[in-house]
């Protein structure tokens, strides 16, 4: 019985039906096996083999078949050798195509329809069966689709008019080389499609120069997706653009989130990290972020998206035999069902190779390898806990089946970072007998060759060691203490993401012996600070781990601090004088934890940055009485808070040390619990940058800001600053299109043919007029690009606000003050990353260097604009941050809001 493609389609359908019924846990392995069979059925190679078989049995072996029934049938001998060299070929042009393909060939797609019954076949095919004409597809004609060199039968290509919309029911499939056909044979061209072939882009006439993300066109697949806009919009978020690249310097527009229940999620084809090339007929390559957002907003109810995505990396399967040693198997894993290491991928990945372990000694297992099985236990589509259990229950001899990527991860944004991050939601377990395999290590997150979760104090060498650091924008990235009475210089703090942290060679408790051959064993604090300051870019440090000496030093500092705190209370300054009460409302510009302030004269009151406090008694120099003001009203609880004077005095005492970063104001988000005083002068130094400065009494310290309550009759603009702001902005507009919008910017650039004045831009004909308006502060932000001015005007923001929508602004922190001056008080929210690791966890496509720069930019933003922030949010996940932002906007929307008062404290 001949094998036909319809039979394959039917078998595939039955397999998929059966797979959908396997929902029980015990069916997981069977389901996985069936999926492998389905993948084989859907592969291009399998389809090609079916084509060969069908051609051989139906055509070459079918003697009665002939071209013209009026002529005598000539038997066709079985073909055993195909001569490809003798095949005729022509370039694809409108002249070479059959009559049915004669319209201008500008766009191509495969026919993806079932084989039609004879009565539905066109007369041209039934009455005049053409001989096999093979068309050579040149690179020139199809380079935008994919670099194809081969032969494609005419029946596989059909033209589409340039403006014709491809209906959602017609999936796009790729142009692939058809099988070479003998010139002398009669061929009935099959019209049955390939089974679920990978998609290819339609409308390539307007996409002459595709942009690549770390790859060539052959690395990508393309798809056209038609969505119907729902009540909550299209249901996805985007990031990127020429003004704010999402990945490195790539200005492409990326899908960053598929909103559950939205149009995109219900359709099921759009994926996170897809790159949008076009929205309907609007090209969104090399456009600003706002331009892409506008294209999506203006696309109407039926939206055609042309997207590209990276093809899955080919993998090499191999088996590795490991023999457990004292350190176990010696590697860490991450991922699993419900705990994906890579978005959309449930696989188990190797994230760290532990030095000296079995995997390290064997040398075959690498970071980024995917674990498929351990001994006879399958690790595909399992939870993280199941994978850990399988690895834990192995004997001394362990056989690992792994998939190794054949392409280098350096070109892949999904490269698993070499980290062990205890604060990460993605569980990362060490496969070693000494660690609890079901739990995350509790040591601080570190970038280093050997995880600090693996090395105990007894395993760290106590011998002097040489460390070479290269000074970065944050300096050397550590603090020092000591230098009094020859007690030595110790490292007291390692800045996350700084050079010292990234090297992994220095740790808290190290004693610094020398810096660039300058002996610091008997140095004072000032001498050590000067040596570090003047050490240049490359700094050679000889350090020795001395945790016992450092612990004694810490105890001494703690005792001294307690003495000073007690002295402050007993001196009489701790009592509240109530003879001249003064009442006011203030906004807190720092976090306060009453449990960390031992000088409190009575019950204290906790508060966070941005909280509104009603100070009911501000007569005392050191302590005030206050109540918290919530959106629901004023709290009944009265507590004591430090006065403005006390906060500033304590902070200045802490800052009265040698600092190497003249712009650093300390951590303005909170008042640390280790604030010093005169007796602690020069106890801590920060080896952060190049300049030394003593903090005088003029040093600006953030404490409280006086505020008044005001009623507003407009919807407040929203400015979000910090990492992941684009994703949050996009999510707000996508989820609440009726509540959030963007304003139309101004430009002196000439209008293009397809642009509409007032919709795409406000086109300003006079550059002099726009420059004058900028000077008169009519713009909250403006700049120049390609000799054209661009800017966001106060009036544009006001127009959106008066329509009852929050105007989402993608501007700098300077715009906050300008809006306040214009009496448009924005809700300004700063997303404060917890660490470099926190940034990488929320955006796995970032490299360590990109995450470091993002973290540094965030710190600089906080230093410059803290006093202008309405609120500061932190979270372990983007979802957590997004929910906090929504709550803050809801609470701060008005109509009664707190605005800065003109009076001074």
Curated annotation (Swiss-Prot):
Region of interest: Interaction with SH3 domains: 162-212
GO molecular function: kinase binding; L27 domain binding; molecular adaptor activity; phosphatase binding; potassium channel regulator activity; structural constituent of postsynaptic density; transmembrane transporter binding
Modified residues annotated as Phosphotyrosine in this record: 399
PTM notes: Phosphorylated by MAPK12. Phosphorylation of Ser-232 regulates association with GRIN2A. Ubiquitinated; by MARCHF2 which results in its degradation.
Occurrences of domain SH3 (ranges): 581-651
Region span, Required for interaction with MARCHF2: 224-546
Domain notes: The PDZ domains may also mediate association to membranes by binding to EPB41 and ADGRA2 together with the L27 domain that binds CASK and DLG2. The L27 domain may regulate DLG1 self-association. The N-terminal alternatively spliced region is capable of binding several SH3 domains and also moderates the level of protein oligomerization.
Name by which UniProt lists this protein: Disks large homolog 1
Source species: Mus musculus
Species lineage: Eukaryota, Metazoa, Chordata, Craniata, Vertebrata
Recorded name of the encoding gene: Dlg1
């Amino acid at each position: 019985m001949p094998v036909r493609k319809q039979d394959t389609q039917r078998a595939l359908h039955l397999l998929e039906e059966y797979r959908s019924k396997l929902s029980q846990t015990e069916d997981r392995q069977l389901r996985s096996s069936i999926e492998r069979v389905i993948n084989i059925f859907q592969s291009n190679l399998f389809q090609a083999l079916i084509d060969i078989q069908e051609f051989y049995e139906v055509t070459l072996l079918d003697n009665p078949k002939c071209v013209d029934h009026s002529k005598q049938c000539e038997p066709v001998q079985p073909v055993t050798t195909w001569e490809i060299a003798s095949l005729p070929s022509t370039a694809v042009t409108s002249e070479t195509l059959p009559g049915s393909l004669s319209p201008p060939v500008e766009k191509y797609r495969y026919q993806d329809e079932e084989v039609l019954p004879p009565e539905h076949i066109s007369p041209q095919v039934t009455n005049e069966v053409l001989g096999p004409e093979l068309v050579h597809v040149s690179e020139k004609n199809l380079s935008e689709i994919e670099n194809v060199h081969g032969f494609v039968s005419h029946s596989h290509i059909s033209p589409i008019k340039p403006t014709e919309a491809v209906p959602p029911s017609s999936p796009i499939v790729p142009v692939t080389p058809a099988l070479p056909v003998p010139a002398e044979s009669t061929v009935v061209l099959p019209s049955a499609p390939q089974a679920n072939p990978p998609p290819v882009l339609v409308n390539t006439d307007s996409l002459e120069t595709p942009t690549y993300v770390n790859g060539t066109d052959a690395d990508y697949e393309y798809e056209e997706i038609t969505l119907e806009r729902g009540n909550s919009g299209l249901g996805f978020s985007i990031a990127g653009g020429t003004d704010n690249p999402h990945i490195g310097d790539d200005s492409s527009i990326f899908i960053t989130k598929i909103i559950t229940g939205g149009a995109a999620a219900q359709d099921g084809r759009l994926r996170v990290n897809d790159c949008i090339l076009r929205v309907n007929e609007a090209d969104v390559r090399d456009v600003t972020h706002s331009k892409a957002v506008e294209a999506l907003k203006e696309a109407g109810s039926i939206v055609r998206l042309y997207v590209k995505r990276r093809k899955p990396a080919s993998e090499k399967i191999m088996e590795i035999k490991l023999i457990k040693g004292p350190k176990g198997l010696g590697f860490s894993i991450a991922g699993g069902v419900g705990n994906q290491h890579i978005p959309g991928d449930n696989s188990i990945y190797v994230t760290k190779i532990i030095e000296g372990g079995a995997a390290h000694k064997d040398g075959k297992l690498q970071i980024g390898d995917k674990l498929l099985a351990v001994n006879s236990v399958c690790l595909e589509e399992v939870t993280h806990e199941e994978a850990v259990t399988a690895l834990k229950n192995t004997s001394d001899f362990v056989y690992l089946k792994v998939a190794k990527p054949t392409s280098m991860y350096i070109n892949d944004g999904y490269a698993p970072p070499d980290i062990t991050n205890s604060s990460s939601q993605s569980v990362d377990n060490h496969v070693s007998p000494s660690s609890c395999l079901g739990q995350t290590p509790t040591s601080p997150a570190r970038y280093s060759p050997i995880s600090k979760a693996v090395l105990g104090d007894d395993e760290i060498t106590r011998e002097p060691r040489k460390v070479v650091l290269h000074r970065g924008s944050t300096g050397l990235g550590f603090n020092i203490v000591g230098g009094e009475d020859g007690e030595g210089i110790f490292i007291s703090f390692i800045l996350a993401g700084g050079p010292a942290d990234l090297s992994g060679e220095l740790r808290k408790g190290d004693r610094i012996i020398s810096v660039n051959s300058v002996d610091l064993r008997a140095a004072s604090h000032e001498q050590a600070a000067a040596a570090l300051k003047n050490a240049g870019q490359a700094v050679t440090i000889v350090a020795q781990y001395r945790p016992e000496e450092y612990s004694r030093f810490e105890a001494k500092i703690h005792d001294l601090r307690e003495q000073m705190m007690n002295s402050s209370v007993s001196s009489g300054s701790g009592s509240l004088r109530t003879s001249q009460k003064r009442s006011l409302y203030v906004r807190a510009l720092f976090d306060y934890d009453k449990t960390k302030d031992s000088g409190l004269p009575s019950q204290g009151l906790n508060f966070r940055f941005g909280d509104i406090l009603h100070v009911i008694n501000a007569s005392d120099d050191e302590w005030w009485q206050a109540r918290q003001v919530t959106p629901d009203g004023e709290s009944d609880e009265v507590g004591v808070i430090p006065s403005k004077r006390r906060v500033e005095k304590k902070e200045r005492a802490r800052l009265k040390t040698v600092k190497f970063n003249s712009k650093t104001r300390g951590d303005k988000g909170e008042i640390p619990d280790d604030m010093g005083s005169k007796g602690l002068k020069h106890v801590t130094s920060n080896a952060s940058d190049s300049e030394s400065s003593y903090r005088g009494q003029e040093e600006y310290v953030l404490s409280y800001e006086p505020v008044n309550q005001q009623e507003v009759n407009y919807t407040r603009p929203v400015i979000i600053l910090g990492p992941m702001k684009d994703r949050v902005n996009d999510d707000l507009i996508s989820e609440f299109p009726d509540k959030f919008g963007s304003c139309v910017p101004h430009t002196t650039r000439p209008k293009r043919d397809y642009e509409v004045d007032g919709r795409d831009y406000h086109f300003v004909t006079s550059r002099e007029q726009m420059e004058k308006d900028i000077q008169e502060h009519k713009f909250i932000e403006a700049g120049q690009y390609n000799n054209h001015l661009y800017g966001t005007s106060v009036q544009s923001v006001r127009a959106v606000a008066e329509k009852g929508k929050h105007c989402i602004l993608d501007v700098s922190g300077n715009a906050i003050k300008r809006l306040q001056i214009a009496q448009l008080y924005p809700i300004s929210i700063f997303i404060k990353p917890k660490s470099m690791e926190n940034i990488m966890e929320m955006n796995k496509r970032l490299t360590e260097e990109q995450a470091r720069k993002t973290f540094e930019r965030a710190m600089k933003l906080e230093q410059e604009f803290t006093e202008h922030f309405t609120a500061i949010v932190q979270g372990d996940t983007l979802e957590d941050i997004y929910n906090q932002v929504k709550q803050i906007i809801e609470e701060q929307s008005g109509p009664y809001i707190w605005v800065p008062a003109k009076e001074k404290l």
